[in-house]
Amino acid sequence: MGVSIRALHPWAVDAAEGRRLQQTLREQLCLKTPRGFRPRLVAGVDAGVVDGGRTIRAAVVVMSLPDLAVVTQSVARAPAIMPYVPGLLSFRELPGVVRALEQLDVTPELLLCDGQGIAHPRRLGIAAHLGLITDLPAIGVGKSRLVGTYREPRPEKGATSGLYDGHERIGTVLRSRDHVRPLYVSPGHRISHEDAVHWVLTCCTRYRLPEPQRAADRLASAKEAPA
């Protein structure tokens, strides 16, 4: 079954073309949650580099809601056709992520991505980009801030503070566990700011990261796992 991918552009682009594509693609983003949205399958998505930076290793872990039981998982490799360029991570990592998504035997209804959604200088972080090419609701869950200013949220789990670039809200700083560093949550595509926070918290249990993303992170970096 897998996930259907829309071929919106080639992946082999230089930095200038990548930035131009981001400016164009951002116009297609939707920050509204579909009416009656109640996902039953949520996927955590993560990717890293192996082979001295020559290969992208991507992992997707699909869990059921609300019990967060693992339904299936997928690992894939793809050549790193673009070097690391700040702000253009999606062009480097998504070819591997696409392969992993296409290998799934189920179709997730929500994607949680390690990285940014619209909390990005050109409003097209990896979660926004992935949401567009899959046409699935997608949320960026960043471990660190890429852009924007905010006030530190209170120390208890569930505390939030708006993340702003000037007067524009680009995300939410979320305390996902008591007295831990916050997460930087931003809508990617087909999800609102409020619902992005809701579903991230729904997927958080004992740890800082939401369970699907935490599982994908471990799978993407596990050298002993098949790929």
From Swiss-Prot:
Its EC number is 3.1.21.7. It comes from the Bacteria. It comes from Alkalilimnicola ehrlichii (strain ATCC BAA-1101 / DSM 17681 / MLHE-1). Keywords: Cytoplasm, DNA damage, DNA repair, Endonuclease, Hydrolase, Magnesium, Metal-binding, Nuclease. GO terms for biological process: DNA repair. Belongs to the endonuclease V family. DNA repair enzyme involved in the repair of deaminated bases. Selectively cleaves double-stranded DNA at the second phosphodiester bond 3' to a deoxyinosine leaving behind the intact lesion on the nicked DNA. One of its GO terms (molecular function) is RNA endonuclease activity, producing 5'-phosphomonoesters. One of its GO terms (cellular component) is cytoplasm. It is found in: Cytoplasm. Its cofactor is Mg(2+). This is Endonuclease V. Pfam families: Endonuclease_5. Mg(2+) binds at residues 46, 114. It catalyses: Endonucleolytic cleavage at apurinic or apyrimidinic sites to products with a 5'-phosphate. The lineage of its organism: Bacteria, Pseudomonadati, Pseudomonadota, Gammaproteobacteria, Chromatiales. The record marks 84 as: Interaction with target DNA. Coiled coil: none annotated.
